[in-house]
Amino acid sequence: MAYEFASRLETFPKYRKFETTFAGRPFVVETGKMCGLSNGSAMIRYGETCVLCNVTMSDKPRDGVDFFPLSVEFEEKLYAAGRIPGSFMRREGRPGEHAILSSRVVDRPIRPLFPKDMRNDVCVTMTVMSLDPDCSAEISGMNGASLAIAMSDIPWGGPIAGVFVGLVDGEIVLNPTKEQREHSDLSLTLAASEEKIVMIEAGANEVDEETMMKAIRAGHEEIKKMLAFINGIVAEIGKPKKSFTPVELDHALLADVYAKHLDEVKAAMDTDDKNVRDAALLPIMDAIAAEHPDLTAADLDLISYKLQKKVVRTWLLEDGKRVDGRGINEIRPLAAEVGLLPRVHGSGMFTRGQTQVLTICTLGSTKDAQLMDDLSDTPYKRYIHHYNFPPYSVGEARAPRSPGRREIGHGNLAERALIPVLPDQAEFPYTIRCVSEVLSSNGSTSQASICGSTLALMDAGVPIKAPVAGISCGLITDGDPLHGGRWMTMLDIQGVEDFHGDMDFKVGGTRRGITAIQMDIKVDGLTYEIVEEALEKCRKGRLYILDEIIKPVIAEPRAELSKYAPKMFSMMIPVDKIKDVIGKGGKVIQEMCANFNCKIDIEEDGHVFISAVDQDDAKRAIATIKTIVEDPEIGAIYKGRVTRLMNFGAFVEIAPGKEGLVHISKLDDHRVEHVEDVVAVGDPIFVMVTDIDQQGRINLSRKDALAAIAKKRAEAGQQ
């Protein structure tokens, strides 16, 4: 039987390639070759960074949900950087912290532009396939995701585009290289549409508000160029948008509910106590359910949301009134406290209204730093901030879960806010971990975590350069602010204002300037005027917290560390001496760690870090290391250990690998007949270096060492 084998070259008739320049580097889009079954797909090549972006949508809406089910996944493949994963299976597992944070950065600008009444599942996936350290995979993924959605048949109000903005030597730099990022005072990820700012995520070295606005404006100008490029592609190959089945309530039913129950909802919500408000709303919703038995649980949730939203927004826009009776720029009652937990290294509790966070600071050695097995620029982290949000903090009766994306994002925000004020590792050679436990939540827990971390760090004696505080600003709009619509910002939003408002603009910083920003919105973007007003309100609120709340409680870091904290010391040794300190098979360093109850970390450049709970143990380890790396000096006294006995004297080890001879005549101040009459193998004895011959052999004297020690004691006694 004969077999025929056909061979043909696969062609891609829909393949298209588009090229432009983005912040001075080539930016290439390829479509029509890969992922033909996705609703929208694009391979982004920025420099040598390659990110494959796909978007898909379910054919039918998901039943029983009262939200838009959007999933955004940023997948980091270590092969992109030529690395094999460090896990046991040598395979990528669950998304790491960096991938989760990148997913959130892309999620936040694209989510508000989807129809709010759509319930079809939408999944956006960005896979990093090649990484050029000078060309951000995150920005490439954001722009690629925007393009993929815009050119797909999925309903969406985009596109948006993103850019990374740095500040190097006082100059604004767009999409800075890896080297520039290392020296930048600003790390700003910006997303925008043609006319509005859609997302801000920033870390900064105390940058002032004016400079921040300049960076935002500069980034927006570059974004407009990318948007023109994306719109050109969509105009050429974009698909017609699909229709979808919107989730709607019967207008007559909603009008009936408003007429009967809106005043009741207003009365229930007119309180500053979240528990009282929630309890007062329950019977109202029970009455609505009884009046309309055909409503589903999702329908009732939507009605409750619309009722509360109408009350909150009407009060603010029409009456300038807030739910809890505060003024528009008034901060909730504040309280701060330090030193709550006796055995921890540092603790601080910050309370703002019904929001309360307790932060605990723990100090560790350099070995405790977090190793980063991902595609981030940082190989390890010496400052770690973890944020925990237990169910009891919102009065829920359920078992706690492992940290989700929100917890990781809030922890990272507080982490970025504090990093600029931390001491250099050379000055303070500790790994620092802060854990923020949310005890009660009614809005702005991430900003309370920033304040709590400042308190805990100073209570622990960490010499931070300046205290940091955080506060948020909200927004209510009626119509498009860009075209005459009304809007109002308010300082220090609580939970109900966050839930029913249009913005959560979070800013952390010192008296000098901003250290972190995170902006979440539910509208299609913000004007420059709104951003500027939010920054200014947060600045004033931040200064009030620093001066009136934090400073009276703890004005500066404690002078001494907790007695339970490890004492850290650092020193430099010659690189060629590292092997001597470690010893064969690690014998020397292991013996020192065991003998002095300490941890010793040695870096490739000769930096040595010693940590011990007892300061004297650490100092003894330092002295031993010095004896190993330094040549013995004539006249120096050492505490050594007898290793061998001979007829003519005793050999004494004054440092690992360094032995000298104490002649029998130098053992004591009287005639010694037998060496074993004075010392035995293993005895610790004081010896003085008396001579080093041309061959490097060391001559020691116990007699001279004892005489010198006795003389010093006598002199000390006379004084």
Predicted regions and their residues:
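Extended amphipathic alpha-helical scaffolds
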Residues: 2-58, 62, 242-377, 566-580, ...
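Long, basic N-terminal domains or extensions that often function
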Residues: 2-245
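Glycine-rich, flexible beta-strand/loop modules in the N-terminal catalytic cores of phosphate-handling
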Residues: 38-122, 128-130, 135, 194, ...
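Conserved phosphate/anionic-ligand binding catalytic regions in large, soluble enzymes, centered on
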Residues: 40-43, 135-153, 338-361, 442-462, ...
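Short beta-alpha junctions and helix-cap segments that line functional grooves
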Residues: 40-41, 174-177, 185-188, 370-373, ...
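Flexible, glycine/charged-enriched surface loops at secondary-structure junctions
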Residues: 116-122, 157-159, 226-244, 275-276, ...
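Mobile "lid/hinge" segments at catalytic clefts and subdomain interfaces of large enzymes
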Residues: 153-268, 457-559
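Single-stranded RNA-binding regions, centering on S1/OB-family and related RNA-binding modules
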Residues: 564-568, 575-719
